[in-house]
Amino acid sequence: TKPYYRTRVLIKSGYYDSLSDEDFFKKVFPKYMGYPLDLENPKTFSEKLQWLKVNFRDPIQTVMVDKHEAKHFIAQRVGNQYIIPTISVWNSVDDIDLDRLPNQFVLKCTHDSGGIVICKDKSTLDWEAAKAKLRTFLKRDYSRIAREWPYKNVPRRIIGEEYLSELGSNDILDYKMYCFHGEPKLTVVCSNRFSKTGTRMNYYELWRLDTSDAA
């Protein structure tokens, strides 16, 4: 059993709910990272992320993690052409009318991370199973289980989006740019995100492929 598995179970069960954010991270960080957390003088990237979780609060963070509101923020600055078209937004799973959705679509919760329902063909979609997944996603609270403050005040809604795919492929590449001091330093390209053999390839400056971390 991996050392952090028990910690994950305890977190989800609410075992650490009474701890302050600082005490929470000092308790669980070593389980995941293998070394103690120093919030007084953070040196590693992971330590600095925990410091930000404890000390940094900005309302714009809430906008950025809201999958619906973030679209408006981005569109106002760079244009709608960079935004995946929204079909609709619902407050409840029961508000979704499957008959009014296109044959292909994507559903996810505006406050969630990772939870998603992808429909490539409505005739083969198990709608009851999809609704059950969405109800589970709606219950997730990253402000509690991960102590990520930005998620605390995000309205729990479901957003429907158009289904996208790469030309000539059923997959779509996911590009993530990591910036340090305002400069892009690391680009991660993800493919096969929702397959059992998901692939992640890490690229660094000048798009040099780092094959050691590919999985």
Predicted regions and their residues:
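Alpha-helix initiation/capping motif
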Residues: T1-R6, Y15-D21, T44, D66, ...
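Hydrophobic transmembrane signal anchors and adjacent membrane-proximal interface regions, especially
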Residues: T7-I11, Q76, L209
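Active-site nucleotide/adenylate-binding loops and adjacent lid/helix of ATP-dependent enzymes
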Residues: Q50-R57, Q61-L173, Y178-E183, T187
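Conserved small/polar residues in nucleotide/adenosyl-binding loops
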Residues: D210-A214
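Membrane-proximal basic amphipathic "stem/tether" segments
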Residues: T1-F56
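Conserved, surface-exposed functional patches that form binding/active-site neighborhoods
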Residues: Y178-L206
